[in-house]
Amino acid sequence: MTTKGILGRKVGMTQVFTENGELIPVTVIAATPNVVLQVKTNETDGYEAIQVGFEDKREVLSNKPAKGHVAKANTTPKRFIREFRDVALGDYEVGTEIKVDTFAAGDVVDVTGVTKGHGFQGNIKKDGQSRGPMGHGSRYHRRPGSMGAVINRVFKGKLLPGRMGNNQRTVQNLVVVSTDVEKNVILVKGNVPGAKNSMVTIKTAVKAHK
């Protein structure tokens, strides 16, 4: 199975109606044309992939090696650079633009993003644990429960308070509702990880139902 992919920014959520009146919640992803910066092959790199750049940035923020790298593709320095494997290398050359029409309505995709960060949180909010007794005289309300008296150590994987969110997560098998090449927009059914204006990666689903 060959993979297609594109980088974009999450704009937010809205809803669309189908011809039969069904309401579908969708996530709007703005994906300006991505540029292929490098085509990697087994002979030169040991694996096959394409390197893609998304969103221009000021040249003053790039060093000479980065400028020289993007100059081979006749483009400007890019803010985000990612790789896509399992692609049909014959369809891409350095400098090729990847637009939203690489996907069509009905395609099934996986969307990867970085979840919202919530800072340091306790077990109840972070892990969904239950509160303790809230009555007068109770010695604990929102603390973690006992870890046991004998083992004299904390088991690996024990759920404890800590930082919540800001993790890379992938939502699988989302359906593309529509694409708009003029506005560089993809509408995907359902929600995707990340805050508004965060960068997301859209790829062909690896577990799509046939």
From Swiss-Prot:
Highest rank taxon of the organism: Bacteria
Chain segments annotated as coiled-coil in the UniProt record: none
Chain spans, region Disordered: 120-143
Cross-referenced PANTHER family: 50S RIBOSOMAL PROTEIN L3 (PTHR11229), LARGE RIBOSOMAL SUBUNIT PROTEIN UL3C (PTHR11229:SF16)
Family membership: Belongs to the universal ribosomal protein uL3 family.
Stored NCBIfam families: L3_bact
Descriptive protein name: Large ribosomal subunit protein uL3
